[in-house]
Every structure is written in C-alpha cells, then in structure tokens.
Amino acid sequence: HCYIATLFSIVNNETSVSKANANNTAKQIVFSGIQPSGNIHIGNYLGALKQWVDLQNKYRLFAMIADLHAITVPQEPAAIRSKTIELARLLIAIGIDPNKSVIFVQSHVPAHAELGWILNTLTPVGELERMTQYKEKRESAGTMAGLLTYPTLMAADILLYQASTVPV
C-alpha cells in the first residue's frame, strides 16, 4: 500500500500530469484515453473526441494517448511513434486546449506500468480470463499476455488520476 501511495505522489507531483492549468485544480477530474493504432474518423470524433472538447470547459480533462494499450496486439514501433505524434497534433487541432487540459502519452508516465504491474500481482487470472475480448481472441495463435492483463492496466490508468468521470 505504501508503494501505491508513492506512485500517486510521483504522478501528482513530478510528471507532466501536474502541469495542468492552476484554474483546473478545484474541478472534478475526467480521464479518458485513445489508442494511436489507426486513423481517426468521424465516428471517433462524434463518439468521443467532440465530447472531450466540451468536457474540458467544465472539468479537469486528462486526455491520454494509450500507446501501452495499443501494443497488446503486435505493432511496428515506428508506426506507433508516428501515430502517437499524429494523434497528439489531432487532439490539439480539434480543440483540446493544452492550457485547459492535460494531453499525455501513457508510456511517458512510468506510474501507469508500475501500478498496472502491482494490480496484476493482486488480480486472479480467472477474473482476467472472463474478459470478453480475451475469450474471443485466446484461441488465436498470436494472443499475447498483454491482452489478458489489459483490464489491470486500464484500472491503473483510472486510479492514478482519481477520476470522477471516465467517458468511453
């Protein structure tokens, strides 16, 4: 438990996450993420991203580029890097204001992987195996452990920011 408290301290005080506009400190936290694994289309915009733009005016928005989640299926490292930069530019272009919100890359905040690992050590494998996506894909030859532990990384993402709202 002490280690988890240390992780919260690290995230809240020593990373880019703490650089949000001081005016946002009293606002409730909204946390959401998007993978840099494909081209953004009108469905992404209308289904999620437009909502983020609106939410940043009322809440303290943490918009995560979920590159660690994206690598649960094989990806070319150069493609992920390129798509991550492209996605960051796109988020700003559609109206996510870096002066109102925090836009960050998941892998640049080590606490995500660290807390994810801690949660992995506390989570029964049977619980993870019940995940629908895992059940559907486990028979394929290319299924990796990252898919199995995806839910614990998602939980870590949310817990680190103590979000009150997590739009999906």
Where in this protein do the model-derived segments appear?
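Acidic, Ala/Val/Gly-enriched low-complexity intrinsically disordered segments
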Residues: 5, 11-14
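Glycine-rich, Lys/Arg-enriched anion-binding loops that position phosphate/diphosphate groups
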Residues: 164-168
